[in-house]
Curated annotation (Swiss-Prot):
The keyword Kinase is assigned to this record: yes
Protein known as: Thymidylate kinase
Binding positions (ATP): 10-17
Organism: Cyanothece sp. (strain PCC 7425 / ATCC 29141)
UniProt lineage: Bacteria, Bacillati, Cyanobacteriota, Cyanophyceae, Gomontiellales
GO biological process: dTDP biosynthetic process; dTTP biosynthetic process; dUDP biosynthetic process
Top-tier EC class: transferase
EC numbers on record: 2.7.4.9
Chain's role: Phosphorylation of dTMP to form dTDP in both de novo and salvage pathways of dTTP synthesis.
C-alpha cells in the first residue's frame, strides 16, 4: 500500500512549522506511529518529517541561496522559480517517493501550492508554466492532504518580527518582500483552497496555538483511520 503525504502550507508567521511539529509529537504520543510501525515491519521509521526548500543535502544549499543570499545579488523571479523546482525534483526523487512507496507517512513543510502562491500570484509568473514545472519536478505527485493555515498578512508578518526579535535573527529574503507581495500570496492560497476543497483544508490560524493544534489533530485522526484501516485491527 502506498503511503500518504500531508503538507502544511501558509504565509509568513502563520505557524505552519510549529503546527507540523506539534502534529509530529501528537502522532508519537498518541501511539499512532507505534501501531503504524507494526503494519510496516520493513520500514525503519514510518514517519518522515521534511521541508521545502531544504529537505535534502542539495536542498539545504539551495535553501541558503533562495532565502539568505546577498541582498545586492538580486535573484530574478524565473531564476527563483527554477531553483525551487530543482529543490523539489531532488526531494521527490530521493526522499518523498521512496518513503511513500514503502507505505510511510510524510509531514512536509511546504510543497507545490507554495510555488503557485509565491511565484505565481506573488511574483506574477505564468500559472501554466508553474504547473508544468511542478509536474516535471514531482513526476505527478500531489499531496493527499494539505493544511492551509490562514492568517491575516499583517498579523503574520508581525508574528515573524516578534519571533525574530526574541531569537536575535533577521528576516529572510522572502519575508522582506513588500506587503502587497504577501497579500498576493495570500490570495493565491485562498484561490487554491477554493479550487481544491477536497484536498486543501483551511485552518483559522488566528486562534490560540493550542486550539489550532487540536483542530489539526482531529482532522489528522479522521484521515488516518480512513487511510490506514488495518491499524484499527491492532
Amino acid at each position: 500500500m502506498k503511503g500518504k503525504l500531508i503538507v502544511f502550507e501558509g504565509g509568513e508567521g502563520s505557524g505552519k512549522t510549529t503546527q507540523l511539529q506539534r502534529s509530529r509529537q501528537w502522532l508519537e504520543s498518541s501511539g499512532w506511529l507505534a501501531r503504524l510501525q507494526q503494519t510496516l515491519p520493513t520500514l525503519a521509521k514510518p514517519l518522515l518529517v521534511t521541508r521545502e526548500p531544504g529537505g535534502t543535502a542539495l536542498g539545504i544549499k539551495l535553501r541558503q541561496l533562495l532565502l539568505n543570499s546577498d541582498p545586492e545579488d538580486v535573484i530574478q523571479s524565473r531564476t527563483e522559480l527554477l531553483l525551487f523546482a530543482a529543490d523539489r525534483a531532488q526531494h521527490v526523487a530521493t526522499r518523498l517517493q521512496p518513503h511513500l512507496e514503502a507505505g510511510g507517512l510524510i509531514l512536509c513543510d511546504r510543497f507545490t501550492d507554495s510555488t503557485v502562491a509565491y511565484q505565481g500570484y506573488g511574483r506574477g509568473l505564468s500559472l501554466a508554466l508553474i504547473d508544468q514545472l511542478n509536474q516535471i519536478a514531482t513526476d505527478g505527485l500531489t499531496s493527499d492532504l494539505t493544511l492551509w493555515l490562514d492568517l491575516d498578512v499583517e498579523m503574520g508578518l508581525e508574528r515573524s518580527r516578534q519571533r525574530l526579535q526574541q531569537s536575535g535573527g533577521g528576516l529572510d529574503r522572502i519575508e522582506r518582500g513588500e506587503i502587497a507581495f504577501h497579500q498576493r500570496v495570500q490570495q493565491g492560497f485562498r484561490a487554491l483552497s477554493q479550487a481544491a476543497p477536497e484536498r486543501i483544508v483551511t485552518i483559522d490560524a488566528s486562534q490560540p496555538e493550542a486550539m489550532v493544534a487540536d483542530k489539526i489533530q482531529r482532522i489528522l485522526e479522521e484521515k488516518l483511520w480512513q487511510w490506514y484501516p488495518q491499524v484499527s485491527m491492532l
